[in-house]
């Protein structure tokens, strides 16, 4: 039985199920492929909410599920007061998975935590009304409305952040086998479908070691 706050995701069609006005609404979401559109969303969120900006930057740079992101506390990503960790340790099926936090993520987190004076025990994506994290539905609305506000016509939701991470990682030369493992998919073809990439589609690879 589905509950009011449940969101499910099929890895091929990636449907979100949300309860709206007495009925369940299913919606397919896509990656944001255009870098200019990504930057437009960032700019919009930065202007309206530091927390929401960090949510988006964190999501598109780590590829974590929204449920995994909302569980994070400030102490989970900080080594000491002014130092964000290089890797966030995610508990996954009784094992620890290292999730790399790049410079953009670190910079966004550091500024956000210090600006809002968050303490170590606070959830990173804390509700403005309670000590709990924002809900999945609220996170969906944040990302969806930001995309609409900057004129993106595609279907964009929280899982778009995860797909955006995967699409751009693949475009920049990351092997599909590594992305398959990251997303916990059964086959490479499942990952390609999840990212919205057809087998015949030609993606211009941009391998940049940034030395």
Where on the chain are the PLM-derived regions?
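Conserved catalytic core of the tyrosine transesterase superfamily
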Residues: 3-211
């Amino acid at each position: 039985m589905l509950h009011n706050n449940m969101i499910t995701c099929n890895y091929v069609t990636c449907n979100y199920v949300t309860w709206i006005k007495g009925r369940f609404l299913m919606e397919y979401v896509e990656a944001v492929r255009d870098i200019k559109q990504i930057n437009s969303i960032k700019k919009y969120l930065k202007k309206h909410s530091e927390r929401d900006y960090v949510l988006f930057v964190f999501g598109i740079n780590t590829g974590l599920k929204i449920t995994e992101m909302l569980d994070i506390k400030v102490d989970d990503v900080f080594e000491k007061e002014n130092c964000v960790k290089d890797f966030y340790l995610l508990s996954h099926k009784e094992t620890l998975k290292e999730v790399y936090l790049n410079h953009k993520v670190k910079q966004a987190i550091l500024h956000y935590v210090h600006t809002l004076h968050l303490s170590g025990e606070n959830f990173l994506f804390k509700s403005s009304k309670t000590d709990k994290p924002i809900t999945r539905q609220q996170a969906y609305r944040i990302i969806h409305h930001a995309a609409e506000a900057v004129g993106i016509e595609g279907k964009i939701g929280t899982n778009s952040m995860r797909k955006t991470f995967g699409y751009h990682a693949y475009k920049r030369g990351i092997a599909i086998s590594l992305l398959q493992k990251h997303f916990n998919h059964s086959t490479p073809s499942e990952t390609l479908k999840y990212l919205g990439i057809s087998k015949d589609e030609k993606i211009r690879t941009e391998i940049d070691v940034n030395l």
